[in-house]
Amino acid sequence: KQFTVKDSMLQDNGKVYITLGGVESAYYLYVNGVEVGYSEDSYDPHTFDITDLLHAKGEKNTLAVKVFKFCDGTWLEDQDMIYDGGIFRDVYLTSTPAVHVQDYDLNYDLNEDYTAADMKLSLNTVNDAVTDAADMAAKVALYDAQGNEVAKTNAVLGTIAAGKAGEKEISMTVTDPKLWDADHPNLYTMVVSLYDQKTGLHYE
């Protein structure tokens, strides 16, 4: 498979990743003739950093996947199932700026009468640049199903050292939360943005 990468994905000091959503049952991944990695476990997605293997903007890149129908985990994985093989879920690219959110964990506690929810967001950030990212902060906003902002907060992250990761605990409260149940499947959308407090430059 050949593909090109959009200019917007090739940001300064950013990263480009490829994710394979599901491949049964094991495979080697190659980009432009270079082995990227090996993976097993058919039903879990796997993500690989391919930034340094990509050609210049506009040039075609070649993706190859060498799939094995059986591996040392097949016996456990395919009990009482039809043995199959191949790519059966989406394959897609994602990109991140130099400073970005790597992972997060969100938990909440409701008060006794369910009229408020105290939210705890554990935010993991990474700086892939060669210089420190100083004066960083995070803006967190929560939206209901109609797109209305129901809660927001800002948190100071400070300096994220070059090539290092950071972690921050952020708290916010949602009043009169619309709870989820089978008859009323209410959902919220959370948006997290990282920005430089001095320049206002947004990274994500």
Task: Cite the ranges covered by each PLM segment.
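Accessory beta-strand-rich segments of carbohydrate-active enzymes
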Residues: 1-103, 128, 145
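Extracellular recognition modules
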Residues: 64-66, 189-193
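Beta-sandwich strand segments
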Residues: 72-82, 150-152, 198-204
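Exposed aromatic-hydrophobic patches
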Residues: 45-53, 165-175
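Short beta-strand segments of immunoglobulin-like
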Residues: 105-112
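Short glycine/proline/serine/threonine-rich loop/turn segments at secondary-structure transition edges
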Residues: 9-14, 54-60, 131-133, 174-189
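N-terminal carbohydrate-binding accessory modules
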Residues: 104-105, 191-204
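Beta-strand-rich binding/interaction modules
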Residues: 31, 115-159, 166-170
